[in-house]
Amino acid sequence: MDFKQYIRVIPDFPQPGIRFKDITTLLKDGPAYKAAIQDLAVFAREVQADVIAGPEARGFVVGAPLSYEMGIGFVPIRKSGKLPYESIKANYDLEYGKDALAVHVDAIQPGQRVLIADDLLATGGTIETTINLIEQLGGKVVGAAFFIELSYLDGRSKIGEIPIKSLVQY
């Protein structure tokens, strides 16, 4: 399926010069959304993921249905200060700002094979931080799956040898 036709591009959002890739047009189309999740599930099975991790917030709308499709667990990687139990956190740079992510200390078991799922790979700051958190807990990141990749921002350079699947590239 050509998923690019389901992505709306919004100029100058959230600030001038940014061309925001809006996935809500994909999400609202049931057959396209389902097909996107199923395509990513093929990749997740290939890398033999034990669990899916998704960074807040749009990683939840990719990762949770992906884990459901596969019948495996989902680990939410939250914004700092949002988790009620003991957690670890790490700071990172966004395409247009700064933030911090956190995960519960018992969310991932040592040796667990983790696939990271998110809507977008841009500069790589979010994925690099998510990998860092998972590895701190002893997890093995076996892949990263995205609806969209902004290849001109070279986020792949922050991932190393981890296999990547992106449905749409800009």
Swiss-Prot record:
Q: According to the lineage, what is the superkingdom?
A: Bacteria
One Gene Ontology term, aspect cellular component? cytoplasm
Main subcellular location of this protein, as a coarse class: cytoplasm
Cell compartments where the protein resides: Cytoplasm
InterPro entries (UniProt xref):
Ade_phspho_trans, PRibTrfase_dom, PRTase-like, UPRTase/APRTase
Write down the Pfam families for this protein, in alphabetical order.
Answer: Pribosyltran
Concerning SUPFAM superfamilies, the annotation shows:
PRTase-like (SSF53271)
Annotated pathway: Purine metabolism; AMP biosynthesis via salvage pathway; AMP from adenine: step 1/1
Q: Which residues form the signal peptide?
A: none
Enzyme's top EC category = transferase
Function, as annotated, reads: Catalyzes a salvage reaction resulting in the formation of AMP, that is energically less costly than de novo synthesis.
Stored NCBIfam families: apt, PRK02304.1-2, PRK02304.1-3, PRK02304.1-5
- Give the record's subunit note: Homodimer.
Recorded family membership: Belongs to the purine/pyrimidine phosphoribosyltransferase family.
What name does this protein carry?
Answer: Adenine phosphoribosyltransferase
Q: Which organism does this record belong to? A: Brevibacillus brevis (strain 47 / JCM 6285 / NBRC 100599)
